[in-house]
Swiss-Prot record:
Its cofactor is pyridoxal 5'-phosphate. The keyword Transferase applies. Keywords: Amino-acid biosynthesis, Aminotransferase, Histidine biosynthesis, Pyridoxal phosphate, Transferase. Signal peptide: none annotated. It catalyses: L-histidinol phosphate + 2-oxoglutarate = 3-(imidazol-4-yl)-2-oxopropyl phosphate + L-glutamate. One of its GO terms (biological process) is L-histidine biosynthetic process. Pathway: Amino-acid biosynthesis; L-histidine biosynthesis; L-histidine from 5-phospho-alpha-D-ribose 1-diphosphate: step 7/9. Its EC number is 2.6.1.9. Belongs to the class-II pyridoxal-phosphate-dependent aminotransferase family. Histidinol-phosphate aminotransferase subfamily. This is Histidinol-phosphate aminotransferase.
Amino acid sequence: MSQNQTTIAPQPGIMEISLYEGGASKVAGVENVVKLSSNENPFGPSDKAREAMIRAAHGLHRYPNTDHAGLRGAIGEVHGLDPDRIICGVGSDEIIHFLCQAYAGPGTEVLFTEHGFLMYRISAHAAGAIPVQVAERDRVTDIDALIAGATPRTRLIFVANPNNPTGTMVGLPELERLARAVPQAILVVDAAYAEYVGDYDGGAELATRLPNVFMTRTFSKIYGLGGLRVGWGYGPREIVDVLNRIRGPFNLSNVALEGAEAAMRDREHIARCQAENARMRAWLAEALAEKGVPSDTSCANFILARFADAETAGACDEYLKTQGLIVRRVAGYGLPHCLRITIGDEASCRRVAHVIGQYMAERAESR
């Protein structure tokens, strides 16, 4: 660079962001790979959603609706929520980004737990805010630690419930206690995995009743639409109004809107996926425990397998790859001794349990 050229610096915080790495889907030299690294629904979207997207493709030359009225109406109908208090985005990631853009900034703080979703830190930095991480208690959100970690500068508190990658969760009374203890901040309940929990509204009732609670949800998990990128948020009208002012008018395509609406309305497909996930989640956790690999009780569509140390976990991951199985290392979440394993279909679960059993047996014999 010549002396006459200058480097134009980005906004504060941008260069603190580490590039996000999604779950791998290929292994060099290995065929018939089973991907269990991204918490995807192994059964994919419902047939009704597929059909709706095909129909919508005939209108790709038309701009989509800007108000997302059809999708918001379907969400409101299914969940018993006011559609006017719902905002839709490009995955729940975009909603998280909107919240940080609108309510955080230089000199403010964004609070989250040590094993929380990486997008909280990324979005805080993108807004120029200070990300603040607090400890968990045995891989479970510690409400007291969050309350103690809050300051007058705290503007947002993110709690994934259930949490990714631990799969653990806290009760709604605890979340309400947190919201009331830190009234100057918005408590964001990230309920991406809420559909995998029985008798749980993801924090919707709290977001209806309290002025500083906001809930985010996604179509990427149980709805099987990770490739479509659709999420939504629900909370006080005042917050939704603010977020809509920075939302791009055409952020969701016609295909995304129609596919997500049809997926939301197909409750039979969701019920089948819920039942199968619960069945195989329990089976896989027990099967791995019998092979000396424990895990916490998971409330999501994955389990967090714990090994003796980081070296053992890493070696197991490499062994799984040689057998065509891709799981997720979670050292970036502060859990280097763990592997996160998506609950796949029955064949995939049995296969990964068998291969991990082989690995553990071979490792024991080599000592």
